[in-house]
Amino acid sequence: MTHNELINNIIKDGYLKTPRIIKAFKKIDRKNFVPEDFKEEAYVNAPLPIGFGQTISQPLTVAFMIELLEPEPGNIILDVGAGSGWQTAILAEIVGKYGKVFAIELIEKLAEFGKANVDKYDFIKKGRVEFVQGDGSLGLPGKA
């Protein structure tokens, strides 16, 4: 299965509906957010291991959550448990140059992995994402 086939299946199943969200899903390739050992499975509609007992969420689940969130350009969003950064990058694409996503991940090595993945799209350099390691249970006081 290809990236476009995965996205089209999620659209066909009714989980992706909003044009700006669909556009972001099409631009942000899940394959860039999975460990090397799982690149071949990146387009399977299933969670995949990303290390440390964690997974990258099932694409259908991410689509469902983002559709419910209804993010808009210019929004400020906190992504708690950002993991490999896939959802963070999708949200950064949606909020655009006037928005910001604060991503927080408890596990240090995953935070490093997620930050590196998000950086592939220059979202950190562009100021759309701030990716930090820490406990997100209290949010990011003063930021999100």
Name every feature range the model reports, one short phrase each.
Residues 49-55:
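Class I SAM-dependent methyltransferase Rossmann-like catalytic core
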Residues 70-144:
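Conserved nucleotide-cofactor-binding alpha/beta core module
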Residues 1-37:
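N-terminal auxiliary segments of SAM/dcSAM-dependent transferases
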Residues 19-20, 60, 109:
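Cytosolic histidine kinase catalytic core of two-component systems
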Residues 7-8, 42-45, 56-75:
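Conserved alpha-helix/loop element of class I SAM-dependent methyltransferases that forms part
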